[in-house]
Amino acid sequence: MTKKQQSFFAIASILLILFLDQWVKIWVKTSFSPYQTVALIQGFIELHFIENRGMAFGTEFGAGIWAKYALSVFRLLAIIGIGYYLRKVILTQNPNFSFLLAIVLIFSGAAGNLIDGMFYDFAFDLDKDFLTNWTRTYDENNAVFLPDEVRKTGFMLGSVVDMFRFTVTWPSWMPFGLGGGEIFPPIWNIADFSISCGVGLLLLKYRKNFGKSNDEKPLEN
């Protein structure tokens, strides 16, 4: 592809992934009740609506406002760095399609989850049913309320919406306590899937090139 075609592909792919990611998240958030589950393919994958304060696949990064700020700033810096690298690769090199696609997938996924944290607190009201990973406090009527220091809302403080979950389980005869348990229990979204595919593509296709300088050998296709 020419540089113009590469630029068009990168921009169009990023916009498409971001659109799909945000469309699914907003649809689930406005249509599902907290923790509501709907089977997509029985025994394989389902929709299960949750929100998380952490990283990809619901991984936690501390349990407070400063941890959330740190994670959001890290995401922002990572996106800026990846975006700068993507632009540099297109303008100064001739990346093959697989490498370009991998960087686009990683950038799109990181940007998709950052959008949640940046803007969702402005677009949606805080749902107190999603405080399971934060401190729950109860008033005299046994109703949940949230002290300011536990869950502040605002720019960079929104939760990430997750919804996809594989329901495939290990055979009952599996050792080490795996029998009957889910093979992949984390709940994820399109942004997480995009990042995982991008990283996986890099590892599969370019692992032999890691650690080599750019002038030693071009990336293999």
Task: Outline where the language-model segments fall.
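Alpha-helical transmembrane bundles and membrane-interface segments of multipass inner-membrane proteins
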Residues: M1-N221
